[in-house]
Amino acid sequence: MEKLYSENEGMASNQGKMENEEQPQDERKPEVTCTLEDKKLENEGKTENKGKTGDEEMLKDKGKPESEGEAKEGKSEREGESEMEGGSEREGKPEIEGKPESEGEPGSETRAAGKRPAEDDVPRKAKRKTNKGLAHYLKEYKEAIHDMNFSNEDMIREFDNMAKVQDEKRKSKQKLGAFLWMQRNLQDPFYPRGPREFRGGCRAPRRDIEDIPYV
């Protein structure tokens, strides 16, 4: 009996030892499993971080060429504007540089202008117009009136106006002649004068310095 009891106790102790040994092993296993899960999570986090960093780097790399392309386009536009401005300035410079040559010519032009009379400065067309007198214009107007569709009254009225113009011209000529006559009398005291200071009539002979008696 004692042997059986001792054997039973030995079996119980062995079972207790086995259970105690199995329990810590079982307890350690969850830790191992936890550590494995943590490692997996860490690896996944690392991969996510790596993916994020890779995406960010890709975006940065994509953004850089765009910014570089914009910078290049801006530079090309600025260079084009500078070239345009430089070309315009270069085109404007030859005109300015050509001025000294044109400035050297005014001396010869002024000399030629000094030799020419003042009438040569008037254009030829203007000369032709000014050379025509009032009588010529009236004659042309008379010829043109016949071609116009005027009634008899209008024709008579136009001819009357033309006659008035001719009379005014004649009177103005007489006034100018009298004015010139007065100036001539004032300038030359020995100019022959008629009665009542009118031109013509009985004129006294002109007396020169030789005819004045010596006193």
UniProtKB/Swiss-Prot annotation:
Q: Which UniProt keywords apply?
A: Acetylation, Nucleus, Phosphoprotein, Transcription, Transcription regulation
Q: Which InterPro entries match?
A: TF_A-like/BEX (IPR021156)
Q: Which domain of life is it from?
A: Eukaryota
Where in the sequence is the signal peptide annotated?
none
Please indicate if the UniProt record lists Protein transport as a keyword. no
Taken from the record, one Pfam family name reads BEX
Instruction: Keyword check for Phosphoprotein, yes or no.
Output: yes
Chain positions found as Phosphoserine: 6, 88, 102
> Where is this protein chiefly located?
nucleus
- Region Disordered: start-end pairs: 1-133
Q: Which residues form a coiled coil?
A: none
Q: Where is the composition biased (Basic and acidic residues)?
A: 25-102
Q: Where in the cell is it found?
A: Nucleus
- One annotated Gene Ontology cellular component of this protein: nucleus
Location of N-acetylmethionine modifications? 1
Cystines in this chain = none
Summarize the protein's role. Answer: May be involved in transcriptional regulation.
- Tell me which family the UniProt entry assigns to this protein: Belongs to the TFS-II family. TFA subfamily.
The entry's protein name is Transcription elongation factor A protein-like 4
Species of the source: Homo sapiens (Human)
Identify the gene encoding this protein: TCEAL4
